[in-house]
Amino acid sequence: MNKRSLIAGVLSVCLMLAMLPAAFAVEQGEANITPQTTMKELRENPSIKGSGYYTYCREMLPIESLYWQNKTLAQYAKPELVEDCAQAMNLVVENYNNGVQVTWQIYTPEEIEANPSLGGAQLFYYPASTPGGKYALVVPGNGNGVTSEMEEGGSAAYQLHEMGYTVFVLRYRSFLAASDNAPLQDLGRAVQLITENADKFQV
């Protein structure tokens, strides 16, 4: 191998190594959600998708997503909640883009394997701007059918975040999975998770 070929080979390897971070970079969305953003646009935002935040507050059946996908957030959410809801989703985007783990399972993988309904019980984490303060656990309503983590939960989380709180929004088991006081069990387990990971959550 002559000197010129060796140099070309070394340069090729260096170029490939330089491209590796870009190749493995996580796609990030923009915090540009407004009341006029459609539900499809919101759900396809790479950071909303990547965060795992649950945004299906009205759909009890998968086919209902087709009806709502081209509706705006203003049409989807209650008028008095929509502005704060949009800001909450922008917070989710910002947190995800900053490397924050937004979605936390409150049960272990072993527990979920034994009872798959436990996989739907989650916490959505909004860290405070200043760590070490108080936290609030938001339990959004309408547990008879579907829960409202984005609309009621998100809007409350945004207001509390603006007051300096670290906020957790609980997605608890509902409808057919809500028997035997399941939502109360989820609430207790959520508090346990927060308490056991207080240093990690900075609360």
PLM region spans:
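N-terminal targeting or regulatory segments adjacent to alpha/beta-hydrolase or S9 domains
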Residues: 2-9, 21-117
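Hydrophobic core
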Residues: 11, 15-19
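A short loop-to-beta-strand scaffold at the N-terminal edge of the catalytic core in hydrolase folds
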Residues: 115-127, 134-135
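Short beta-strand element of the alpha/beta-hydrolase
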Residues: 133-142
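Short beta-to-alpha linker loops that shape the active-site pocket of alpha/beta-hydrolase fold enzymes
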Residues: 142, 171-175
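Serine-hydrolase catalytic-loop signature spanning alpha/beta hydrolases and amidase-signature enzymes
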Residues: 143-146, 167, 193
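Short amphipathic alpha-helix adjacent to the substrate-entry channel of hydrolases
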Residues: 149-168
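Alpha/beta-hydrolase active-site loop
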Residues: 178-200
